[in-house]
Regions:
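Class I S-adenosyl-L-methionine-dependent methyltransferase catalytic core
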Residues: 1-190
Length: 190
C-alpha cells in the first residue's frame, strides 16, 4: 500500500475501488479493486481532523458496505448526495443493475466531530451528463464539496486525476489528467 500523507485534513473525498462479486460487460474495470475489509482498514481516521467531513462514493449495491466504511473511518453518517446520470438529451442513463437498471451513484456524507456545513442551500442531488470515462466523477462534485465544507485542507483518496487545491492519494493519480473543463450539470432540476 502507498504510504498515507503525514498531514491532517478537514475534507476526505474518496471513491474506493469496490470489488464486485461479478464482472459486467467486458468484465474488466481497468484498475485494481479492494475488498471492503481492506478499505475499512485504511488509516483514514489518522489523517482526518477532529472536526471533518467525509464524502464517500458508493454504487447502489455497495450502500451498506459504504456505511460500514464510513463508520470504520471514524465518521458518523448524516445523509446521501445522489448523482442522477443523464444522457446529453437530459434523459436518465440506462445503466447496469442486479435487479433494476441503475442511473444513480451516491456520495455518503459523514461527519467527524460536530463540523457543520458552510452552505445550507446545497441540495442533496444533482443531474450531470455521464459522458466521462468509467469511474470518472463530475468535477462539479468537488466544487459542491468546497462550497459546503469550506476552503480547508482536503484530500481525494483513490484519486485518478490531480486537481489544484486538492492533495491526492492513490496508485493512479494521473489517469484522467487534462485541462480542467467545466461539466455540463444542473442542480436539482426536477
Amino acid at each position: 500500500m502507498l504510504p498515507f500523507p503525514n498531514k491532517k485534513y478537514g475534507i476526505i473525498y474518496a471513491d474506493p475501488p469496490w470489488q464486485y462479486k461479478e464482472n459486467w460487460g467486458n468484465g474488466q474495470v481497468g484498475y485494481e479493486t479492494m475488498k471492503v475489509k481492506d478499505i475499512c482498514k485504511l488509516p483514514v481516521s489518522d489523517i482526518s481532523m477532529d472536526q471533518s467531513h467525509l464524502y464517500l462514493w458508493v454504487t447502489n449495491p455497495f450502500l451498506a458496505e459504504g456505511l460500514e466504511v464510513c463508520k470504520s473511518w471514524g465518521f458518523n453518517y448524516k445523509t446521501l448526495i445522489t448523482w442522477i446520470k443523464t444522457y446529453k438529451n437530459g434523459q436518465p442513463e440506462m445503466g447496469m443493475g442486479y435487479y433494476f437498471r441503475g442511473c444513480t451513484e451516491h456520495v455518503i456524507f459523514g461527519v467527524k466531530g460536530k463540523m457543520k456545513c458552510k452552505n445550507k442551500i446545497t441540495r442533496n442531488m444533482f443531474y450531470a451528463i455521464n459522458s466521462r470515462k468509467h469511474s470518472q466523477k463530475p468535477n462539479c462534485v468537488r466544487e459542491m464539496i468546497t462550497k459546503s465544507s469550506g476552503d480547508i485542507p482536503r484530500i481525494e483518496l483513490f484519486a485518478r486525476e490531480e486537481i489544484q487545491g486538492w492533495d491526492c492519494w492513490g496508485n493512479d493519480t494521473k489517469k484522467f489528467n487534462k485541462p480542467y473543463i467545466q461539466d455540463s450539470f444542473q442542480w436539482n432540476t426536477c
